[in-house]
C-alpha cells in the first residue's frame, strides 16, 4: 500500500494495553504461531513456551528524571558496542511507538519464531546496526506504521491533531510505557527503548527456567519492603556496639603490653641480683681454699687439718644453705609476674590491626548515618509532595486574580500578554501560526514628487479644527 514516508516519523498513534490488540497486531506484522496473554499473578504457572514478557507502567517524565541518578549507580548496563549491536535493541526515536518496540524486542531476539516476510526483512536489514539506526528503521517501515495505526482509537487521532503544534521527541513520553524482558544467550535482558543501553540481569540457575529469574527480578522491583529507616537504625546500632567493643579491646591490649614490659624489667633486675650474690659467694670460697693450701704447705698435723676440713665443709654447707635460703626468700619477695590475660582468643590481634578495624568501623558509621539522613529527608519530601498534591489552590488563584482586578492591573496584564504574543517581528513579518505574512509599506510617488498625506496627519488636523471651533 502507498504510504507517505515523510509522515511516518510523526504519525504514530498511541495504543491501548490489551492482549487481544497485541495479538492482532502480531498477525498484521505477519508473525505466525504466537499470541499475547495478560498476566495478573507472577507466581501463577504459565502453560506452554514463553518467549518474553512485556511490562506496562504509567510514564511520568518527572519520575524518570528522579530515577536517572539511581539507575546509573545500581543498574548493570551493557555498554560494549559490539555486544549491544549483536542483539536487537532499538532506541525509541518515534513517539507513541513503544508498543511496537516492545513486541519487536521480544520477537527479533528469538530464533524459533516464524516472523513472516516483513519482520524477517527488518531483522536482516538491521543486523549489526546501532540502537539509533534500528529505531529509525522501525519508524520508516511502512508496514509497521500502518499496522500500528490501524488499531488506534479515534480519540488518539484527535489527540494527535490537537498536539500537532507541540514538539514531540524521544523523551516527551506517552501516558504508558512498555518494557520487554526476554532471554538472550543464557541471560535475562531488559530492553527499554528510552534507556541508553540494554540491561543485563545475569544468568538464571541450572535447575530453573528463565521465567523464574524474571519473577525474582520483578518481585524485587515491585515488592513492598520494610521501612529502610528501621534497618538502617539497627545497622547503625550494631556498628556502634562493635566500635565500643573494639575500643575496649584495644585499650585492654595496650595495658597488657605495658604490664608485660614492666614484669620483664623486674625479672631482669631479680636475675642480676642473684648473679651478683653468686659471684660474692664464689670469691669468699676461693679465699678459704687458699688458706687451706697454705696450711698444707706448712705440714701441719693431720688432725688439725682434718678439723679445719670439717669446719670448712660445715662452713661450705652452711653457705650453700644460706645461698639457697636467700634465693628462696628473694623469690618469695619478688614472685614472677603472672602471664598476661589471653586476648579475644587463640589468634590475638596487634594494636595496629585493631586500630585499622576501628577506623573502618568509624567510616562505616559515617556512611550509615548519611544513609539514615537521606531516608529521613526523602520521607520529609514525601510529605511535602503530598501536601502540594492535596492542597486546593483554587481559593488562592481566585483571590489573587480578584486582587489584581480590584487594583486595575488584571486587564493591563492580559492586554500586555496578548500584545506580546501578537507583536510583529522586524521587517514587517508577522507570525500567524506557522505562516509568515509580509506587509508592503512602499510609498506611492506623485507627479510632482510629493508623497501622499498619511491618514494620521488628517486625523490630527481634524481634531485641531474641532478644538478651534470650540
From Swiss-Prot:
Protein family membership: Belongs to the peptidase C12 family. BAP1 subfamily.
Name this protein carries in UniProt: Ubiquitin carboxyl-terminal hydrolase calypso
Subunit description: Catalytic component of the polycomb repressive deubiquitinase (PR-DUB) complex, at least composed of caly/calypso, Asx and sba (MBD5/6 homolog). The PR-DUB complex associates with nucleosomes to mediate deubiquitination of histone H2AK118ub1 substrates; the association requires the positively charged C-terminal tail of caly, probably due to direct binding of DNA. Interacts (via ULD domain) with Asx (via DEUBAD domain); the interaction produces a stable heterodimer with a composite binding site for ubiquitin.
Keywords per UniProt: Chromatin regulator, Coiled coil, Hydrolase, Nucleus, Protease, Thiol protease, Ubl conjugation pathway
Chain residue ranges for the region called Disordered: 423-470
Residue span(s) of domain UCH catalytic: 11-241
Chief localization: nucleus
Lineage: Eukaryota, Metazoa, Ecdysozoa, Arthropoda, Hexapoda
Amino acid at each position: 500500500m502507498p504510504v507517505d514516508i515523510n509522515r511516518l516519523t510523526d504519525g504514530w498513534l498511541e495504543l491501548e494495553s490489551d492482549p487481544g490488540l497485541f495479538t492482532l497486531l502480531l498477525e498484521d506484522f505477519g508473525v505466525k504461531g504466537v499470541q499475547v496473554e495478560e498476566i495478573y499473578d507472577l507466581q501463577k504457572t504459565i502453560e506452554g513456551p514463553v518467549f518474553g514478557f512485556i511490562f506496562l507502567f504509567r510514564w511520568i517524565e518527572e519520575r524518570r528524571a528522579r530515577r536517572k541518578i539511581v539507575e546509573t549507580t545500581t543498574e548493570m548496563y551493557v555498554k560494549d558496542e559490539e555486544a549491544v549491536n549483536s542483539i536487537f535493541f532499538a532506541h525509541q526515536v518515534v513517539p507513541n511507538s513503544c508498543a511496537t518496540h516492545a513486541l519487536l524486542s521480544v520477537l527479533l531476539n528469538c530464533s524459533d519464531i516464524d516472523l513472516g516476510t516483513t519482520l524477517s526483512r527488518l531483522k536482516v536489514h538491521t543486523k549489526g546496526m546501532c540502537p539509533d539506526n534500528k529505531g529509525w528503521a522501525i519508524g520508516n517501515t511502512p508496514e509497521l506504521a500502518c499496522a500500528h495505526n490501524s488499531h488506534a482509537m479515534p480519540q488518539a487521532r484527535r489527540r494527535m491533531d490537537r498536539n500537532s503544534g507541540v514538539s514531540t521527541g524521544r523523551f516527551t513520553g506517552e501516558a504508558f510505557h512498555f518494557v520487554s524482558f526476554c532471554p538472550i544467550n543464557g541471560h535475562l535482558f531488559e530492553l527499554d527503548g528510552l534507556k541508553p543501553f540494554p540491561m543485563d540481569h545475569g544468568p538464571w540457575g541450572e535447575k530453573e527456567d528463565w521465567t523464574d529469574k524474571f519473577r525474582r527480578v520483578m518481585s524485587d522491583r515491585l515488592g513492598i519492603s520494610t521501612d529502610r529507616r528501621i534497618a538502617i537504625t539497627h545497622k547503625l546500632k550494631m556498628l556502634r556496639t562493635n566500635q565500643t567493643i573494639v575500643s575496649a579491646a584495644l585499650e585492654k591490649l595496650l595495658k597488657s603490653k605495658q604490664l608485660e614490659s614492666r614484669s620483664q624489667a623486674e625479672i631482669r633486675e631479680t636475675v642480676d641480683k642473684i648473679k651478683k650474690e653468686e659471684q660474692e659467694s664464689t670469691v669468699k670460697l676461693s679465699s678459704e681454699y687458699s688458706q687451706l693450701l697454705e696450711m698444707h704447705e706448712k705440714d701441719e698435723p693431720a688432725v688439725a687439718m682434718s678439723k679445719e676440713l670439717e669446719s670448712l665443709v660445715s662452713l661450705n654447707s652452711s653457705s650453700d644453705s644460706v645461698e639457697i635460703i636467700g634465693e628462696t626468700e628473694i623469690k618469695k619477695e619478688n614472685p614472677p609476674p603472672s602471664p598476661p590475660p589471653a586476648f579475644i582468643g587463640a589468634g590475638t590481634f596487634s594494636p595496629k590491626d585493631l586500630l585499622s578495624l576501628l577506623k573502618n568501623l568509624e567510616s562505616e558509621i559515617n556512611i550509615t548515618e548519611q544513609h539514615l539522613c537521606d531516608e529521613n529527608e526523602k520521607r520529609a519530601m514525601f510529605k511535602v509532595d503530598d501536601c502540594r498534591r492535596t492542597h486546593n489552590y483554587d481559593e488562592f488563584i481566585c483571590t489573587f486574580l480578584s486582587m489584581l482586578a480590584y487594583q486595575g492591573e488584571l486587564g493591563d496584564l492580559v492586554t500586555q500578554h496578548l500584545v506580546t504574543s501578537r507583536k510583529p517581528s522586524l521587517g514587517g513579518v508577522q507570525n500567524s501560526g506557522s505562516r509568515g505574512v509580509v506587509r508592503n509599506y512602499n510609498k506611492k510617488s506623485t507627479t510632482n514628487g510629493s508623497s501622499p498625506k498619511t491618514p494620521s496627519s488628517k486625523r490630527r488636523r481634524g481634531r485641531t479644527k474641532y478644538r478651534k471651533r470650540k
